[in-house]
């Protein structure tokens, strides 16, 4: 049976099936559970989670319903539970009873809904079959894909109790360290914590207490840890152990132009993490406004924005995967900061925005920074960044991930939610009535104008609203002629409809009424 995809999605959204899903996959189940079901299960679990709908196939914006009766779907449900608990089928069962349900779409046509949560990093990789190197999948904008062995090995390394930066580097020596860097670290520690007991130690025991030098229990030999070399090492030594290591700061005068200032490993300095941080920070923070704050009778030149920016900088170093590709890249624009680091996030995006749960990839490097007062250990770092940007009435920080190679990008825009020039542009396109729209709709249009488009996921991070509420607003903005959708389903993006302008009638009144009607729970 052929149905418009949007119609089926609307039915399922009204039933509350899709409300929390970031991604969606349809599967036909006419002949039983398809093999691709398990590929999607693995892919969702190793990514940001998602929803699988069995009993539907999708093509060219249409859904083709299998027409399965309830008795057939219940049989597939029993088969599903038997298979997911079989270790030879899949490595781990992440689901509970509430994650799997039968839904009637229309008449006697049923589908099986499977909501897959993102797996904790401790359970990754989630793979099908008995060979993780061949049975691990992940998700990107094109769909499910089989991971390369290198991706699988990095997931496995992140799942181990010993963090990658705590491992002893075989054949490393003290000669691999840049001692002037170590002296600088001591001096800063002395300035912030003059009575710290580590300061009385000689270099070797000092490095041991920091976790930079330790014994390999398997061989009985001492050496530098990955953290010790990355933090205090010589550039050549770092690159011998970490061939893809790269750190790069760029200051760019305006969007699209070439950098006007840059710090990168050019051979004139030892490009370890400590030197990179302390060379970049003054340039990164130079243009920030300095508040007048008093602390114990003394003026403080740094406020919440400085602290948040430093937290973001430290986090990009603490959470980076130094075996990954691309290195750490920091870009400063006149109106924004970009922090990009190799690796994938060890907590779901939703958890990052909530705060309160930090899972650093490099705990020893985090300790080294936290001794100097940088890098939160209590999971409040993201909240500090969000709070500071909110206090300045700037657009909410946006974090995104890409893979192949894995990269995490934190975008900190110093723009108000509704810039004057954006409102003027919207007024030029749609007429003066656009200013009378309710706040969230105006934010959606302004974001689409500034960023070239919006998605449900982007707006969830911006508006702090449920995906179902945002879906209603986006649908209404499309129906009234303000937005044009591209693609269909949960991955739809929306762009300003610059071709036809405002229809007759009051959009903001229509939207308010329609939203209130759909949200009425009385």
Predicted segment positions?
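Short, cationic-aromatic polyanion-contact patches
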Residues: 438, 488-511
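Short amphipathic alpha-helical interface segments
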Residues: 434-454, 522
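Conserved N-terminal catalytic/coupling substructures associated with nucleotide/phosphate chemistry
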Residues: 1-304, 310, 314-426, 432, ...
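Amphipathic alpha-helical dimerization/coiled-coil segments
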Residues: 506-522
């Amino acid at each position: 049976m052929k149905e418009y995809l949007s119609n089926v999605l609307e039915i399922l959204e009204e039933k509350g099936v899709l409300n929390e899903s970031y991604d969606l996959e349809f599967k036909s189940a006419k002949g039983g559970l398809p093999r691709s079901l398990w590929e999607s299960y693995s892919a969702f679990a190793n990514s940001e989670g998602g929803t699988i709908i069995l009993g539907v196939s999708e093509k060219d914006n249409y859904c083709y319903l299998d027409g399965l009766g309830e008795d057939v779907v219940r049989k597939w449900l029993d088969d599903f539970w038997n298979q997911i608990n079989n270790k030879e089928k899949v490595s781990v069962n992440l689901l509970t009873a509430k994650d799997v349900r039968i839904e009637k779409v229309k008449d006697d046509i049923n589908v099986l809904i499977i909501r897959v949560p993102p797996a904790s990093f401790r359970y990754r990789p989630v793979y099908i079959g008995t060979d993780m190197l061949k049975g691990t999948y992940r998700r990107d904008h094109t769909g499910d894909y089989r991971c390369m062995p290198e991706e699988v090995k990095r997931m496995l390394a992140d799942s181990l109790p010993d963090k990658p930066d705590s491992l002893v580097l075989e054949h490393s020596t003290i000669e691999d360290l840049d001692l002037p860097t170590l002296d600088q670290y001591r001096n800063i520690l002395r300035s912030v914590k003059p009575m710290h007991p580590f300061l009385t130690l000689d270099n070797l025991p000092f490095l041991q207490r920091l976790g930079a030098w330790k014994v390999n229990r398997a061989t009985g030999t001492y050496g530098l840890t990955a953290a010790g070399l990355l933090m205090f090492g010589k550039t050549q030594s770092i690159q011998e152990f970490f061939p893809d290591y790269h750190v790069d700061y760029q200051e760019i005068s305006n969007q699209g132009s070439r950098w006007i200032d840059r710090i990168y490993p050019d051979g004139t300095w030892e490009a370890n993490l400590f030197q990179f941080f302390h060379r970049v920070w003054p340039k990164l923070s130079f243009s920030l406004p300095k508040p007048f704050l008093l602390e114990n009778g003394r003026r403080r030149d740094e406020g919440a924005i400085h602290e948040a920016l430093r937290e973001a900088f430290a986090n990009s170093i603490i959470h980076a995967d130094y075996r990954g590709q691309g290195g750490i890249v920091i870009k400063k624009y006149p109106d924004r900061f970009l922090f990009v680091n190799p690796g994938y996030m060890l907590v779901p995006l939703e958890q990052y925005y909530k705060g309160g749960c930090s899972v650093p990839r490099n705990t020893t490097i985090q300790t080294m920074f936290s001794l100097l007062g940088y890098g939160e250990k209590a999971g409040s770092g993201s909240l500090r960044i969000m709070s500071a940007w909110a206090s300045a009435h700037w657009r909410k920080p946006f974090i995104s991930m890409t893979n192949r190679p894995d990269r995490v990008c934190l975008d900190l825009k110093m723009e108000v939610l509704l810039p004057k020039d954006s409102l003027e542009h919207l007024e030029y396109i749609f007429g003066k009535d656009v200013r009378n729209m309710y706040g969230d709709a105006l934010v959606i249009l302004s974001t689409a104008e500034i960023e070239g488009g919006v998605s449900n996921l982007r707006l969830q991070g911006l508006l702090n609203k449920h995906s179902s509420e945002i879906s209603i607003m986006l649908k209404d903005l499309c129906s009234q002629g303000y937005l044009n959708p591209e693609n269909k389903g949960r991955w739809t993006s929306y762009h300003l409809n610059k071709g036809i302008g405002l229809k007759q009638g009051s959009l903001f009144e229509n939207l308010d009424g329609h939203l209130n009607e759909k949200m009425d729970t009385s």
